[in-house]
Amino acid sequence: ANRAQEIARLNGIYDGLMRNAGVLRLQGHGRLIDGQTVEVTDAAGRATRHRARHILIATGATPHVPDIEGRELVVSSDDMFDLPAFPQRLVVVGGGYIGCEMASIFRGLGAQVTLLYRGEQILRGFDDEVRQFAADEMRKHGVDVRVRCDVARITPGAGDTRHVVLADGGTLEADVVLYATGRRAHVDGLGLREAGVAQAADGSIVVDERFATSLPGVYALGDVVGRLELTPVALAEAMALVDH
């Protein structure tokens, strides 16, 4: 309840900032028609078209869970703060910063946490010394960090528990299995292909050094372009685009 209240408070602040800046907010689903037109469909199904000289796409990304047996038994990072009960035993699959954050948070709250990562070391893409230090500190604080460890499948356990079957034949039992195995650009239904906006193989929007897409007049930034998916990075990109 406190989390929901805080989110509502922050949303109210952002709404006020936009109103004071003269921003008109349209509630609905947006679809790109061309380089200067967006169609917005509201909850009642009414569609209106709006034109602008420049269009910015900043729809973010959503958690990606690989297509493994038992994927319906796992949760994503978006679900972790809406769990019906605190997990006494948590298995985190994925060694990126989101997985490491979640593992550390729930260990700090008292959960027994195991983090599984199929690579050689957690936090791929970060400085090697930082990666080793983070792994050592997590282990020091009680997180069971296992590298070169892959999951074969997830099966139901007794009650609401889950069995994590590892590729080497080992098993783990958990109350919650969190998959933090990356995020994918949130582009479904935006009409990018029809409008002529180029996308990478993973669905993210292709942009140049000035955040321009392949469609003149349309820009994109933040997680939807598939670069460093961090809030400070998105804010810096937005400021750079505004200055440009």
PLM segments and residue spans:
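A Rossmann-like FAD-binding core segment of flavoenzymes
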Residues: 24-27, 31-40, 109-209
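Conserved redox-cofactor binding core of oxidoreductases
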Residues: 17-56
